Amino acid sequence: ILDNVQANLANLSNAHFDKGLAGIGWAINILHEQNAVCGDIDDILYNVDAAVYKEITKHDANVGLSVTDGVNGYLVYLLSRMKNPKHDCNGVQHGLMKKATMRCVDTICGQAPSLFSGLTKDIYISAIWNFPWVFVLFKQTMDLGIYTEKIKAVIQEWSHYLRCSLPYYHLNRLSLCVSFAYLNTTLHSRELEGHVDFLLSNINFAGLRREVSEKIFNMNEGWFMASHLLAMALLYIPNNKSVYSELA
């Protein structure tokens, strides 16, 4: 399968995460970390790196926040590449990926504020919802030492909007809550902890069960991702919270 994929990489022009080069490169990178792919990872993914970089930095780019076909998906790919211990952190490709990562953060910072008003009106149940991914990826970007001060300042600037944001669906509330708790393992912000407490106190876990159908098996809307969110909540939400027993 991998031989066929790599042989056809040059024929793909779509750089998106769900059906394009970014997602394929992400999968190859994970397999390389597990020693299932041999060779220099920077050579193997050279063309993918170039395609993603071009897509992110072209002047007429008009990408949304989506994981599937937007800036969050590109950021997932870039961060996974730079975290690979076998990646050359001193090479030219690393410099380009770092630049592309900063461009992604800039794009998010420019787009997100105009969308905050829709947070409370979003009637689409989705575990891979755009907004939580922003905060998950911000944390991973800071962990690599990229744009740390800018991201801290942006979170502070957005704090008022986040404090007023209560998504309509309980699954989306849990998703946003987990992303805040995960981000706060790096920021250690009392204000962000307050956002976590606010969301937790407004999650009806019985209601959450009604929102998730055991008959849906896709990762975005089904029980699999809801279970994963609950597992992440147990990892990142302090066990002294009053709702911890309900999470468990």
Each predicted region: which residue ranges?
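Glycan-recognition and catalytic cores of secretory/periplasmic carbohydrate-active enzymes
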Residues: 1-248
